């Protein structure tokens, strides 16, 4: 059996090869770079066909009392910015770890574009990304189907492109000024091929379901405006939020984390979003700090990028769903999964926000399982027996098989490792984070308990979002 890392790389290469084959096919048939937009009526029909779930009634509001954390007071009506800085933050500069760099290399929500898409100054004050429209005729896409962004181009007869925000696996994201409303929006431009188009329609369908259930926009999912076609690309318009939690961590809590009150505020809003997702029967499937945006005052959080989201009934078993550091154990093991995978991702994200460190920085799925058992103890035999990928990581006696790669012999090494009790549990790790007041110490104890419940190895025992919202961690002291 090959190392997980090489297996994952091979899968990624195969996907890239398939994408190139699809693009070549469309170039040959003349569909790959068509300047003709799909009519809006046809687009709506396509979205309706993709939707597999009937509209649901609005989600009932969470009942809170005066003793709960004052989200509204610290929310959009506040005139002051949230102080997210950890009072124990060191002033000394630090270097980003290699695992953090690797995880954000090709992420559209990282703090800056990857080196391959960064703009360069020409010396004349004009970005090299600005191109002549005459040069772009019949050549609007690159070889992989990404739209070639043109600054000051008009989209859908109303949006003026202001800047290129970044590029991900499925799309390019730009900021654009809406002339009709004199307001800036983020526009997600899906890659030009049939597979990406259908995935984009699926995302539109899910976004519309979520908005139908949250008409007042209080459940902390990114606000979706509308969609349209441009040069054969599906485009989705979203509210503009310029910062994500990765940015916040780098700026205010690099390697030391944020203040526990900031973590508490963000955590409550995360679980509000999870509650909406669960009631709509939607799995986000890619929750991480990069995919949680905040406003300028840093007191409102919204979960974004539902490109990997799906209906809970479509949970196909695959070992590489969700970004690796935030990947729940049931995904790696091939155990039936549902909405609790998002709760696991939130737990990992909250630990990272408070400590400034990635909780499970495994470079392979096998390493991820080892780190999880060091933190939470061994998996139950009952859970392992129901896992499709059991033999990839455990022997016949349910002993974990640690897989490493010998750099000298270039061979895979395998050795059994027995786990019983946790050796690096959540509580012992968080105790290393200093507290400045008795109040902060008490709140930290409650955070420990909440994280333990979010990170249950068995998803059936993991805390549901509606229960998490009532946890003592959110009771105002």
UniProtKB/Swiss-Prot annotation:
Q: Where is this region: Disordered?
A: 25-123
Q: Point to the regions of Polar residues compositional bias.
A: 74-86, 113-123
PANTHER family listed in its UniProt record: DUAL SPECIFICITY PROTEIN KINASE, SERINE_THREONINE-PROTEIN KINASE PRP4 HOMOLOG
Q: Which GO terms describe its biological process?
A: mRNA cis splicing, via spliceosome; positive regulation of mRNA cis splicing, via spliceosome; signaling
Residue(s) carrying Phosphotyrosine:
320
- The record places the active site at 286 (proton acceptor)
Q: Quote the protein name from its UniProt record.
A: Serine/threonine-protein kinase prp4
Identify the keywords attached in UniProt to this record, alphabetized.
ATP-binding, Kinase, mRNA processing, mRNA splicing, Nucleotide-binding, Phosphoprotein, Serine/threonine-protein kinase, Transferase
Catalytic reaction list = L-seryl-[protein] + ATP = O-phospho-L-seryl-[protein] + ADP + H(+); L-threonyl-[protein] + ATP = O-phospho-L-threonyl-[protein] + ADP + H(+)
Chain intervals with Basic and acidic residues compositional bias: 38-47
Transmembrane portions of the chain = none
**CDD domains, per database record:** STKc_PRP4 (cd14135)
Record GO terms (molecular function): ATP binding; protein kinase activity; protein serine kinase activity; protein serine/threonine kinase activity
The UniProt family comment states: Belongs to the protein kinase superfamily. CMGC Ser/Thr protein kinase family.
Name the residue ranges with Low complexity bias: 87-98
Modification Phosphoserine, positions = 92
Q: Name the InterPro entries for this protein.
A: Kinase-like_dom_sf, Prot_kinase_dom, Protein_kinase_ATP_BS, Ser/Thr_kinase_AS, Ser_Thr_dual-spec_kinase, STKc_PRP4
* Residues that bind ATP: 165-173, 188
EC number, UniProt record: 2.7.11.1
Question: Which is an annotated Pfam family here?
Answer: Pkinase
Give the originating organism: Schizosaccharomyces pombe (strain 972 / ATCC 24843) (Fission yeast)
- The record places domain Protein kinase at 159-477
Query: Main role?
Result: Has a role in pre-mRNA splicing and is essential for growth. Phosphorylates srp1.
């Amino acid at each position: 059996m090959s190392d997980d890392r090489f297996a994952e790389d091979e899968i990624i290469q195969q996907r890239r090869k398939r994408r190139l084959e699809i693009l070549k096919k469309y170039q040959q048939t003349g569909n790959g770079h068509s300047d003709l937009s799909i009519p809006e009526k046809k687009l709506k029909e396509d979205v309706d066909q993709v939707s597999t779930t009937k509209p649901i009634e609005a989600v009932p509001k969470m009942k809170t009392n005066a003793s709960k954390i004052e989200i509204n007071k610290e929310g959009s009506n506040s005139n002051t910015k949230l102080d997210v800085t950890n009072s124990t933050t060191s002033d000394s500069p630090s270097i980003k770890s290699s695992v953090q760099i690797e995880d954000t290399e090709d992420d559209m929500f990282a703090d800056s574009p990857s080196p391959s898409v960064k703009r360069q100054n020409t010396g004349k004050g004009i970005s090299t990304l600005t191109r002549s429209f005459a040069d772009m005729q019949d050549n609007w896409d690159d070889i992989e189907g990404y739209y070639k962004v043109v600054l000051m181009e008009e989209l859908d007869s109303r949006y003026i492109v202001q800047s290129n925000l970044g590029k991900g696996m499925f799309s390019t994201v730009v900021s654009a000024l809406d002339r009709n409303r004199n307001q800036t929006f983020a526009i997600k431009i899906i890659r030009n091929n049939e597979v990406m188009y259908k995935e984009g329609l699926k995302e539109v369908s899910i976004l519309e379901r979520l908005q139908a259930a949250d008409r007042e926009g209080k459940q902390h999912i990114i606000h979706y405006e509308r969609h349209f076609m441009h040069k054969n690309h599906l485009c989705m318009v979203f509210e503009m939020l310029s910062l994500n939690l990765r940015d916040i961590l780098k700026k205010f809590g690099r390697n030391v984390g944020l203040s526990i009150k900031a973590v508490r505020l963000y955590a409550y809003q995360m679980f509000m979003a999870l509650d909406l997702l669960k009631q709509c029967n939607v799995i986000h499937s890619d929750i991480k700090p990069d995919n949680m945006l905040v406003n300028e005052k840093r007191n409102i959080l919204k979960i974004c990028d539902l490109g990997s989201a799906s209906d809970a009934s479509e949970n196909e078993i695959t070992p590489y769903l969700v970004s690796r550091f935030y990947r729940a154990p049931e995904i790696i093991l091939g155990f039936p999964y549902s909405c609790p995978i998002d709760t696991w991702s939130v737990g990992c994200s909250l630990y990272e926000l408070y400590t400034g460190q990635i909780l499970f920085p495994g470079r392979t799925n096998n390493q991820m399982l080892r780190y999880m058992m060091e933190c939470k103890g061994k998996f139950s035999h009952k859970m392992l027996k129901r896992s499709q990928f059991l033999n990839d990581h455990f022997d016949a006696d349910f002993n974990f098989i640690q897989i490493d790669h010998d750099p000298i012999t270039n061979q895979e090494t395998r050795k059994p490792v027995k786990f019983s009790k946790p050796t690096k549990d959540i509580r012992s790790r968080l105790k290393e984070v200093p507290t400045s007041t008795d109040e902060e110490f008490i709140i930290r104890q409650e955070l420990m308990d909440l994280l333990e419940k979010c990170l249950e190895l068995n998803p059936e025992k993991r805390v549901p979002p509606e229960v998490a919202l009532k946890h003592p961690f959110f009771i105002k002291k």
